């Protein structure tokens, strides 16, 4: 059964086309991974099929009474709402049904026997619906999902405005999973999850009987939950049966076959053109030349897609710092309340340390405390000598209106325009991206702009807060290579073991010293 039908979809921003004549059908129960390079339009695609964005052309038709659930990290959570109330709101439609049933029972004393029988039938139907949807197990379901996502530890009575960005996303995800919509749309759900919660989400999605479309650059996660791949590339959407690894196998084979056919055809075109040029003027061979020309004119010329620019990250290293990068003495981090016990930490030159642990336990706060951006509640941080620090924040300020060129020029005013454009191009950004405002770019493209600032400055210590979030597979692989080759020290928050395996010299589990668990 088809639950979504898309026909001849075309859309773009200004003179930049995102899709051209895309058509597909989504069937009940399909588990789809939506993949493609940064900037190909995956999130735009989600916004279009959910009606948040009107396409330039095309028809989008959902089956009747299909419930669509979309993990939108920008949904407003207002003060006064608790974790528990947001999660329970997933069942508002059931509470409405219960109220309707209670209203029916309240009317029974005021009606005749025939009307009473009708009302009792209605109430019975509603009761069956409530039972079918496990209405009387709502509290147990809320507890199960809250525990699985690490929200139970925070307390279901906690106000949502006191949560970190990652924790708020978990609350929204929990609500969405409890709603069990007919089609679940998830845009990079693992960005704010630690390993334990990702494992739970894998199990949940594998058991999910309804359909879902998942955007993710986490390949092991994709491989474990999807049975179809939709590949967005060069304004088209292609469907592949199987997981991501199977898709790559078929895609590379098709690409090699197309290149072989292209090369063969180009050789044939060259020979035909050469024959026509040599023989069209001679009376004896003019007819043969005209025949070859007709063949050329009728030929369906194979075109190869333009190669996507692949990023090249090469970090510049500053002078050698002192032995210690930093030392902490009785450091207690936090805002109004402490997030940690008293910490006595030290990092030596050459170490590449990864901070792990659940969201909201203080990993980002530790980075900011070391940098002096947040004052500790008690204790001190002593920075080493001759440090040249590079800092990568988890998210950028979305109110900034500068273009990519202006962002880099503001950071490096001595650069010529050629140097600015070259620096951005090396990070995998095209001319159209470079001239756009940073805030209109995809999350992955924004991350590449911020990485561009880092790699063009000499550093000897990098503090990186979830640098892999939003990056596509090629960019992630290149970043890992560059960080492995980096001669300086690294302190990095990361939730992807596949990324930091073989890169980290040490892994610090922050759950051992947090006060939040």
Locate each region found by the language model.
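ABC ATP-binding cassette signature C-motif
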Residues: 1-260, 309, 318-517
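Intracellular alpha-helical coupling/juxtamembrane segments of multi-pass membrane proteins
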Residues: 250-300, 305
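Post-kinase regulatory C-tail/linker adjacent to protein kinase catalytic domains
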Residues: 313-315
